[in-house]
């Protein structure tokens, strides 16, 4: 439970930090084509509901909860959580904060995939007391599907992002290129899981995670069909989020079932 709470708080901190830097760059203010609530930021700052300063203070407050909480959890479980958590927080900060601003260098999707892979690895390490190869391997397919969420979300935001120098993959590749990459990442994610089971790295019931494949396929088709009309991508975005959720939950259910069946 403590692991779940800390993961949620860290995720919230990363999102709030991103809101601050998107507000300062003008990316969210100039975004008139976002698909709320999935793209274009929370818009709380742009609507005047909170100030940039208040948002920054919230990010700091969240970090003040995450850091000592993570240290305590590491002392209780495994010291490995220290480097896992430190790397995750560093990447969450570097995603949008200068001078790195990885999201503006076409590295945002990879960064977020790495962060969520670390969540899987860290959560297992807390329960196990050490880092183990199976969750490391398992986290990759999940991270790739998370990357697809960032990728497809960047398509409706591409024009506003480009106007402020935020060179996401959707900006660099264009909508068609993003659609091709989306399909490739979805194929790699599910192929990676199947290959891992075939090589006996993961147990057979991890294949339950392939339940997300039809969702990813449907989203890929919609993205390809509507690449020139990104304002119509809401169903594809919903399917993409659902695919990541189903992938993780179904795989977890399959692994958990091994205890009773």
Identify the function of each model-found stretch.
Residues 1-5, 67-83, 120-140, 191-206, ...:
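Helix-coil boundary and interhelical linker segments in multi-pass alpha-helical membrane proteins
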Residues 14-20, 43, 90-103, 150, ...:
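C-terminal ends of transmembrane helices
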Residues 110-124, 171-175, 238-251:
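Small-residue-rich segments of transmembrane alpha-helices in multi-pass membrane proteins
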């Amino acid at each position: 439970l403590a692991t779940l709470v800390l993961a949620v708080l860290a995720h919230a901190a990363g999102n709030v930090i991103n809101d601050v830097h998107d507000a300062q760059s003008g990316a969210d203010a100039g975004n008139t084509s976002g698909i709320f609530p999935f793209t274009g930021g929370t818009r709380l700052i742009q609507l005047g509901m909170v100030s940039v300063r208040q948002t920054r203070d919230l990010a700091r407050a969240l970090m003040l909860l995450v850091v000592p909480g993570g240290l305590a959890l590491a002392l209780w479980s495994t010291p490995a959580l220290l480097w896992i958590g430190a790397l995750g927080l560093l990447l969450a900060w570097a995603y949008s904060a200068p001078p790195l601003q990885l999201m503006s260098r076409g590295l945002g999707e990879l960064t977020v995939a790495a962060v969520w892979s670390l969540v899987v690895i860290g959560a297992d390490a807390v329960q196990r007391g050490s880092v183990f190869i199976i969750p490391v391997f398992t986290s990759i397919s999940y991270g790739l599907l998370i990357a697809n969420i960032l990728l497809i979300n960047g398509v409706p935001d591409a024009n506003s992002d480009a106007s402020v120098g935020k060179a996401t993959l959707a900006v660099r590749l264009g909508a068609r290129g993003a659609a091709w990459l989306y399909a490739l990442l979805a194929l790699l994610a599910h192929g990676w899981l199947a290959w891992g089971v075939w090589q006996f790295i993961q147990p057979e019931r991890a294949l339950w995670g392939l339940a997300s494949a039809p969702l990813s396929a449907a989203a890929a088709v919609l993205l390809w069909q509507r690449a020139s009309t990104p304002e119509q991508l809401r169903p594809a975005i919903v399917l993409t989020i659902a695919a990541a959720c189903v992938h993780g939950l179904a795989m977890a259910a399959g692994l958990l079932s091994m205890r009773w069946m």
